[in-house]
UniProtKB/Swiss-Prot annotation:
It comes from Verminephrobacter eiseniae (strain EF01-2). It is an enzyme of class 2 (transferase). Its EC number is 2.5.1.39. It is found in: Cell inner membrane. Belongs to the UbiA prenyltransferase family. GO terms for cellular component: plasma membrane. The chain crosses the membrane at residues 21-39, 95-115, 118-138, 140-160, 164-184, 209-229, 233-253, 262-282. One of its GO terms (molecular function) is 4-hydroxybenzoate polyprenyltransferase activity. This is 4-hydroxybenzoate octaprenyltransferase. Coiled coil: none annotated. Gene3D superfamilies: UbiA prenyltransferase (1.20.120.1780). Its cofactor is Mg(2+). The gene is ubiA. The lineage of its organism: Bacteria, Pseudomonadati, Pseudomonadota, Betaproteobacteria, Burkholderiales.
Length: 295
């Protein structure tokens, strides 16, 4: 290992997981899907830019808070032992300052939308801050993560329509099951370490039912999205995308069924493609409809 000191920029990029995009991509695809549904098609460049940048920035801010909250646990977990806050390369106050700056940048983006979005951004921020501490209090902290990650859906409808209709909450609930699925896969990677240090996760709570529960969550996620959007008459592309997403879920079963660290981590890292597939089906369906109506 090189003894050359790392630059602050390098440490900050490591702190916010800049080189590991899977974490913000799983937040981004449901948010973009909600934007398209709320706008009944392309939402416009302004909102697209706000939500793409906002998702990336807030996920990065969340990493700062998470690493501060978990610093005493992370040093005992092989995967997280070298995180900047855990090693002391970035101080606690410094990490929180980075997170605060990022949160302010995200709020600046929200201010360019409307009053409803601004109002909903407050509970979104509070839940994001609360999640890292949920692992000490609840047996399924992934549900709290789901609430935090899924606020993008709520904010998308608020930004487009100025309200959050029932369909948004059905999509929110469906995506909750997706978060439970992929973050349980993630938790399975660290299960042995988490048992030793007393962290609560869905992988520990579910025990030998973990794989079955994950597959059920994938099924509920896709089923609820189909049910919520069936009245939108999105057409064949949407259902082809849902079928492709289901095929990916079955592939994940092959990756996680032996419960190996490598298999579970691989399943988590490619999960964003499942969300991307659903978004592609939705965006493609609206594009086809637009072309047909103007053809």
């Amino acid at each position: 290992m090189s003894g050359t000191p790392r630059s602050r920029l390098s440490l900050y990029l490591d702190l916010i997981r800049w080189n590991r995009p899977a974490g913000w991509l799983v937040c981004l695809w449901p948010t973009l899907s909600a934007l398209w549904v709320a706008a009944d098609g392309f939402p416009g460049w302004h909102l697209l830019l706000v939500f793409v940048l906002g998702t990336c920035i807030m996920r990065s801010a969340g990493c700062c808070v998470n690493d501060v909250a978990d610093r005493d646990f992370d040093r005992h977990v092989k995967r997280t032992a070298q995180r900047p806050v855990t090693t002391g390369a970035v101080g606690v106050k410094e990490a929180l300052a980075v997170g605060a700056v990022l949160a302010l940048l995200a709020f600046g983006l929200v201010l360019s939308t409307n009053a409803a979005t601004i109002a909903w951004s407050v509970p979104a921020l509070l839940v994001a801050i609360a999640y890292p501490y949920a692992k000490r209090l609840v047996s399924m902290p992934q549900t709290v993560l789901g609430i935090a990650f899924n606020f993008g859906i709520v904010l998308a409808f608020a930004a487009v329509q100025g309200r959050v209709p029932a369909v948004a909450w059905w999509l929110w609930l469906g995506t909750m099951f997706w978060v439970l699925a992929y973050d349980t896969e993630y938790a399975m990677v660290d299960r042995d370490d988490d048992l030793k240090i007393g962290i609560k996760t869905s992988a520990i709570t579910l025990g030998r039912l973990d794989v079955a529960a994950i597959m059920l969550c994938y099924l509920l996620f896709l089923s609820l999205w189909v049910w919520a959007l069936h009245s939108r008459a999105l057409g064949a592309l949407f259902y082809i995308a849902i079928a492709a997403a289901l095929a990916q879920a079955l592939w994940h079963w092959r990756l996680i069924r032996q419960r190996t660290r490598a298999g579970c981590f691989a399943a988590f890292r490619v999960n964003h493609w499942l969300g991307c597939t659903v978004f592609a089906g939705i965006a493609g369906s609206y594009l086809v409809r637009h072309l047909q109506s103007n053809g």
